Amino acid sequence: ADTIVAVELDTYPNTDIGDPSYPHIGIDIKSVRSKKTAKWNMQNGKVGTAHIIYNSVGKRLSAVVSYPNGDSATVSYDVDLDNVLPEWVRVGLSASTGLYKETNTILSWSFTSKLKSNSTHETNALHFMFNQFSKDQKDLILQGDATTGTEGNLRLTRVSSNGSPQGSSVGRALFYAPVHIWESSAVVASFEATFTFLIKSPDSHPADGIAFFISNIDSSIPSGSTGRLLGLFPDAN
C-alpha cells in the first residue's frame, strides 16, 4: 500500500470509522482514521482557503482552513515526517464523492519546500504555483476523474454537463516533479502548501471531502476508495 500523510477537509461524518459527528478537518498519518481533528463549518458554495505548514525543528504539521467571513478551523499534530515518509515524495490533492455528493473544485494551489543542509549551508527548494489550470496542464499528473481547464479550474471529481456533482467519483492531481522532503544531513526540512477550493452541493449532506496529501512517488488511487476513503486509502483501518 502507499504511504500517505494527508490533511483532510472532511465534509461528511463517517462515525463508523472514527470520524467526529460533524464536518471536520483532520490530519491523517497512513490511515483515514485521523490522528487529530477539529470542527469545521463548511460553507456550501463559498470559496475557502486551506494553508498547511510543517517544520522539522518543531516536528509539527498544522493546517488552517478559512473563509472570507473570518470563519476558520485549525488543527495540528506533532509528527516526525522522516520516520513516516520516504525521502522523495509527490504532493497532491485528492477528493471523492459517494452516495452523497459535492463539487470538489480547486481554484489555485501553491507549494514550497526547503531543505537546509549543514554541510554546504545550501538550501534546496522546490516551489510551484497555479493561479489557474489549463486544459492541457503538463506539469500535473491527473488520476481518476480529475480534469483541468473548465473555467481555469481543477475539478477533482465528476460533474455533469450542467455542472451538477456526481456520486461515487474519485480524482487526484499530483505535481509531476518529485519533492525531496527530508534528508539525513538536513538541519531543517520545511514545507508549506496553500489551495483555494469551492465545495458546492445540492444535497443537505455534501460528501465526501478534499485532501492535500504527500505520498510515495508512484502512488495511485486505491481501488474502492471513493466516498469516505477520499481517494487515499484502500480501507478504513
Swiss-Prot record:
GO MF annotation list: D-mannose binding; metal ion binding; toxin activity
Residues annotated for Mn(2+) binding in this entry: E8, D10, D19, H24, S34
Record text on subunit structure and interactions: Homotetramer.
CDD domains with a match to the protein in the record: lectin_legume_LecRK_Arcelin_ConA
Further remark: Binds one manganese (or another transition metal) ion and one calcium ion. The metal ions are essential for the saccharide-binding and cell-agglutinating activities.
Family classification: Belongs to the leguminous lectin family.
Domain of life: Eukaryota
UniProt keyword annotations, A-Z: Calcium, Lectin, Manganese, Mannose-binding, Metal-binding, Toxin
Binding-site residues for a carbohydrate, renumbered to this chain: Y12, L99, Y100, R228
Identification of the protein by name: Concanavalin-Br
Organism: Canavalia brasiliensis (Brazilian jack bean)
Lineage: Eukaryota, Viridiplantae, Streptophyta, Embryophyta, Tracheophyta
Binding site for Ca(2+): D10, Y12, N14, D19, D208
Pfam hit, one: Lectin_legB
Function: Glucose/D-mannose specific lectin. Has anti-inflammatory activity in rats. Induces histamine release in mast cells from hamster and rat. Induces lymphocyte proliferation and IFNG production. Shows toxicity against the aquatic snail B.glabrata at concentrations higher than 20 ug/ml.
